[in-house]
């Protein structure tokens, strides 16, 4: 029973990741957002909240990144509405956008390793 719940959460997370990426790229027409990439989604066990981890390929400044995430957070109601129309869930989770630092940390580690060689 427990593994079925985990598998269901993983499937829902993957589906939310795929659909939110499509919605952002095709329906959110705000040039201030830039080029976001959704690197992962964490859905709570009760399906009430979803943390959407996002990176930006065209932004390096933390202020620009925070501003873009703020814009996405303000559009989260619209994104959630479109998500509800495209998914077969009783309740669609509240979306919380967070910046994913793992890509930058990975680049730093690769640079450090290359300097050691």
Curated annotation (Swiss-Prot):
GO molecular function: ribosomal small subunit binding
Highest rank taxon of the organism: Bacteria
Cleavable signal peptide: none
Keywords: Cytoplasm, Ribosome biogenesis
GO CC terms of this entry: cytosol
Alphabetical GO biological process terms: maturation of SSU-rRNA
Localization, UniProt: Cytoplasm
Location, primary (coarse class): cytoplasm
Function of the molecule: One of several proteins that assist in the late maturation steps of the functional core of the 30S ribosomal subunit. Associates with free 30S ribosomal subunits (but not with 30S subunits that are part of 70S ribosomes or polysomes). Required for efficient processing of 16S rRNA. May interact with the 5'-terminal helix region of 16S rRNA.
Family: Belongs to the RbfA family.
PANTHER family associated with the record: RIBOSOME-BINDING FACTOR A, CHLOROPLASTIC-RELATED
Subunit structure as annotated in this protein's UniProt entry: Monomer. Binds 30S ribosomal subunits, but not 50S ribosomal subunits or 70S ribosomes.
Name the record gives this protein: Ribosome-binding factor A
Source lineage: Bacteria, Pseudomonadati, Pseudomonadota, Gammaproteobacteria, Enterobacterales
């Amino acid at each position: 029973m427990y593994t079925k719940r985990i598998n269901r959460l993983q499937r829902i997370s993957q589906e939310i990741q795929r659909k939110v990426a499509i919605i952002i790229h095709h329906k959110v027409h705000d040039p201030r957002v830039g080029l976001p990439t959704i690197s992962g989604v964490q859905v709570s066990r009760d399906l009430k909240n979803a943390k959407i981890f996002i990176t930006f390929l065209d932004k390096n400044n933390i202020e620009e990144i925070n501003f873009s995430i703020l814009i996405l957070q303000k559009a989260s109601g619209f994104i959630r509405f479109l998500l509800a129309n495209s998914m077969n869930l009783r309740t669609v989770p509240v979306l919380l956008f967070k910046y994913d630092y793992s890509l930058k940390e990975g680049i730093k580690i690769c640079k450090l390793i290359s300097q050691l060689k």
